[in-house]
């Protein structure tokens, strides 16, 4: 959990440490920074599609592996060269990495999919296929997506595309029996 991470970071991190949290929690960096002021703690998010195939075996059914990270608005840009180096190192390993000036937009864009699909999937006890077709499941999903989109606009975030349409396109590419990690946990 996030709370369990704080004592560890307080013990090992210094002013020369760069932390890039990639949890599915919006604003993780700011939360950690309040308890751990010494290191530079960015915000980040990750897109990866993986699943447990068998005990000890994790597979990627589709090659989705993207990482976004960056400074929050108003955050001092300490260790910027190191953050750029992390981006380059990740790219050299084949990861689609982005050190961005718009991390809040990127993180909220991701959150606009994972949170609504997880919550609606649990609430309705449905898998991905139910959200692909017009009906109650898709309507609930899109309502939740648009709530997050509205929140983003209120925060001053301008999205490049309609998040509802974007997230329906994501669903099109998934198997009908797909579930989120929230549902599997």
Where are these regions (language model features)?
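Helix-loop-beta segment of a Rossmann-like dinucleotide-binding subdomain
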Residues: 10-13, 58-72, 122-132, 178-184
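Helical "substrate-binding/catalytic lid" subdomain
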Residues: 104-185
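Hydrophobic alpha-helical packing residues
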Residues: 9, 86, 90, 144-152
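Rossmann-fold dinucleotide-binding core
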Residues: 23-110, 116
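Short, conserved clusters of charged catalytic residues that mark active-site
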Residues: 4, 27, 181
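Rossmann-like NAD(P)-binding element
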Residues: 1-15, 19
């Amino acid at each position: 959990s996030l709370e369990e991470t704080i004592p560890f970071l307080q013990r090992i991190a210094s002013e020369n440490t760069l932390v890039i949290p990639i949890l599915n929690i919006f604003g993780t960096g700011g939360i950690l920074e309040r308890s751990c002021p010494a290191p530079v703690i960015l915000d980040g998010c990750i897109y990866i599609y993986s699943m447990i195939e068998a005990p000890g075996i994790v597979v990627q059914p589709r090659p989705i592996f993207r990482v976004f990270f960056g400074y929050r608005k108003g955050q001092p840009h300490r260790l910027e060269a190191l953050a750029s180096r992390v981006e380059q190192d990740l790219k050299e390993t084949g990861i689609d990495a982005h050190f961005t000036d718009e991390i809040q937009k990127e993180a909220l864009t991701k959150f606009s999919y994972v949170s609504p699909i997880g919550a609606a999937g649990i609430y309705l006890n449905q898998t991905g296929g139910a959200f692909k077709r017009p009906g109650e499941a898709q309507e609930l999903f899109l309502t939740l997506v648009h709530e997050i989109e509205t929140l983003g606009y209120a925060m001053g975030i301008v999205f490049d595309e309609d998040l509802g349409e974007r997230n329906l396109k994501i669903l099109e590419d998934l198997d009908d029996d797909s579930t989120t990690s929230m549902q599997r946990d």
